[in-house]
């Protein structure tokens, strides 16, 4: 997936010659102390940041060669902090994951991802009024909706601190 990634921010070396191999069907976790660069590495791997050096590939193709539309159909990203303040319903936020953005979401897909993430009980509620853990589950459902094909998510799911606001029940049952 990536070889020799390096990134400087100002004079500070954030990522130094990191290589990562990710395989389909596997779950990989990055573990380290706060400030170690895990979130930055995730942003490099997903194309949100451009490295100073190194190469990145998704499904054998250089990340830079993917169009934004094609990339959004193959990988979904849940960032650590989501700054969504829009007064939308839970269903609207989840449907935002469909590609292209604004495409009509299949009601069966919405129902499936809402059930998988425990968001079915949040139907009709407004996103800003949700707790942090509920918002986190909605964001996970949005990512799953983005990748949902043929009854299951198909593609690469990149999650940054996906359980940080979840209670113990959802921490154990979602991932």
Regions found by a protein language model. Name each.
Residues 107-122:
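Conserved ABC ATPase "signature" region
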Residues 31-33:
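The feature captures the beta-strand-to-loop junction immediately N-terminal to the Walker
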Residues 126-130, 134-135:
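Conserved ABC ATPase signature
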Residues 22, 54-62:
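Conserved ABC transporter NBD signature motif
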Residues 62-76:
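ABC ATPase NBD coupling module
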Residues 46:
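Helix-to-loop junction immediately C-terminal to a conserved catalytic motif
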Residues 152-161:
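Catalytic Walker B motif of ABC-type/P-loop ATPase nucleotide-binding domains
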């Amino acid at each position: 997936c990536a070889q020799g990634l390096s990134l400087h921010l100002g004079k500070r070396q954030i990522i130094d010659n990191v290589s990562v191999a990710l395989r389909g069907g596997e779950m990989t976790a990055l573990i380290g102390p706060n400030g170690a660069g895990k979130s930055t590495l995730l942003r490099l791997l997903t194309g949100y940041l451009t490295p100073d050096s190194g190469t990145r590939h998704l499904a054998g193709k250089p990340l830079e060669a993917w169009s934004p539309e094609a990339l959004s159909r193959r990988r979904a990203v849940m960032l650590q902090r989501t700054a969504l303040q829009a007064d939308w319903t839970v269903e609207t936020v989840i449907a935002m994951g469909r590609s292209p953005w604004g495409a009509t979401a299949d009601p069966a897909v919405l129902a499936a991802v809402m059930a998988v993430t425990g968001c079915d009980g949040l139907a009709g509620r407004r996103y800003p009024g949700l707790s942090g853990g509920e918002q986190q589950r909605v964001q996970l459902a949005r990512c799953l909706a983005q990748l949902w094909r043929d009854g299951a998510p198909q593609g690469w799911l990149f999650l940054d601190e996906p359980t940080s606001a979840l209670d113990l029940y959802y921490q154990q049952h979602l991932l």
